[in-house]
Swiss-Prot record:
The lineage of its organism: Bacteria, Bacillati, Bacillota, Bacilli, Bacillales. The keyword Membrane does not apply. It is found in: Cytoplasm. One of its GO terms (biological process) is sporulation resulting in formation of a cellular spore. One of its GO terms (cellular component) is cytoplasm. The gene is spoVIF. Transmembrane segments: none annotated. This is Sporulation-specific transcription factor SpoVIF. InterPro entries: SpoVIF.
Length: 84
């Protein structure tokens, strides 16, 4: 990918692409049926996005992902956070 592309994303979102790449790398072999793993991912994404995730919403996201109803990706978590 073009380095300027990443710089534009960083500028618009405030999220460093290195942080995104590090998170993506840590997810490759993660067990998404494990509640603690999913909570950790939610907290990392929330921290990167500078968003607070209320406990009730976190519980809903965890239940959706660990039950297999939802796939774990930034889009899914972002959508759930926006629908609070």
């Amino acid at each position: 990918m073009d380095n300027q592309f990443f710089k534009n994303i960083e500028k618009k979102t405030g999220v460093k692409m290195q942080d995104v790449m590090n998170l993506a790398g840590s997810l490759q072999n993660a067990n998404f049926k494990d509640e603690n793993t999913v909570r950790s991912v939610i907290n990392r994404v929330a921290q990167m996005a500078n968003r607070r995730v209320p406990k009730e919403l976190e519980d809903k996201i965890v239940e959706s992902i660990t039950s297999g109803k939802e796939k774990l990706d930034f889009g899914t978590i972002s959508k759930m956070m926006d629908n609070k």
